[in-house]
Amino acid sequence: MQRFWTGAAGAGPPVIDRAHGVHIWDKSGKRYIDVTSGPIAVNIGHGNERVLEAMREQAGRVCFAYPSNFESPDSTRLSALLAGLAGPGLDCAFFVSGGSEAVEKCLQFARRVALARGQPGRYKVISRNPSYHGSTRTTMSLSADPAYAPYLLGHPPGIHIDAPWSYRLPPGLGAEEHARECTQQLRTRIVAEGPESVLAFILEPVMGFCGGATHAPESYYREVREICDEFGVLLIHDEIVSGAGRSGTFLAADHWDGARPDLAILAKGLGGGYVPLAAFLAPAALVDAVAGEGGFHVGHTHKAHPLACAVGLAVLSETVEHKLIERARDTGAYLRAQLKHLQGNSTIIGDVRGLGMLNAVEIVADRDSRRMLPRSMDVVGRVQALARATGLLIYGRRTHAGRFGDWIMVAPPLIATRADIDEIVTGLGRCLTTLERELATSG
């Protein structure tokens, strides 16, 4: 498997043996802390007995039934639970196997909404630069990453506006002013494209793999909502990373007044890493409008998969009953406080940011100037190697060829205790101290 991304059959990662809670063990017996919940998916931790029992029980009855032939009781129950957690206006769920598929299906549904409304000319989707929405060709075109260019030859180019930043701000602008510039870009672009042709605007309320837990000021989300309403554009929130409670609310949109989307997309934490599961959520009024015009008939072998939905129901039930959303908020605040303390003793931690248990640390050459380290140093790869040796599994990126900085995610499972947080921060501190010494030596 590793040969697909390394191009060689050399030494690969360690072989996994088992996992429980926030810990993973390899075949040699070495223990790791899952600092980023895999790729920010393992919300309730590994080896949860309730989830394993739900998996066994459902597998013993039926693993697969195609939705055209049978309705799965657990898909109905999961949809109802999601509607209750997501709140008014996101009443119905369409289940698929992964985030990229959910984004694709959500956009297809949005197109059906336009047709049901008698607006066949609406087809354009505006997204942000940077952003990350998946790994299919359509979702890559939304994501605006130059690394994807070789895969997109012949594909219609995406329509992008700038995403707002909180750390790497344009010269002379504060976060509020920069956010206002970005919302003005949205208005200008809708007008330039022709409002009657614009179908949707898609954004990540908290950036995941494109910007390391960056979010905008509250005013940004409210103004985006107002602009979309003004021009009849559907607002889609990609909550694949931030949703299912990770940000300290079920949807990150709930952190800000007036920010509610028309459509929302969930994955990762929805299945908790136990099964491939994703969904988009839609208002009953839009679902009924589409149904009245013939329905949303899109074939997908594993949509509303009975086993996946049974496991997803157990994951969300565990999340609710053990108050893991509230725990994400409280433990996440403690985590950021500890990371900021670490920042105070470091010359290379430029920024600590995030919401709930979705956080990032940006690494810089110099904290005062915010100067980035040279690409040749591969600072993220070096931190990951140091962390792995210490027993920490960390995800990080150098975004858009370094244009938006080097950062590592600190997003452990929502079940992490303060003792777990202390161990993570202590280990990370050692890694960054080692890196500081290496940088000082190299000049």
Annotate the PLM regions.
Residues 1-443:
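Conserved N-terminal phosphate-binding loop of PLP-dependent enzymes in the Aspartate aminotransferase
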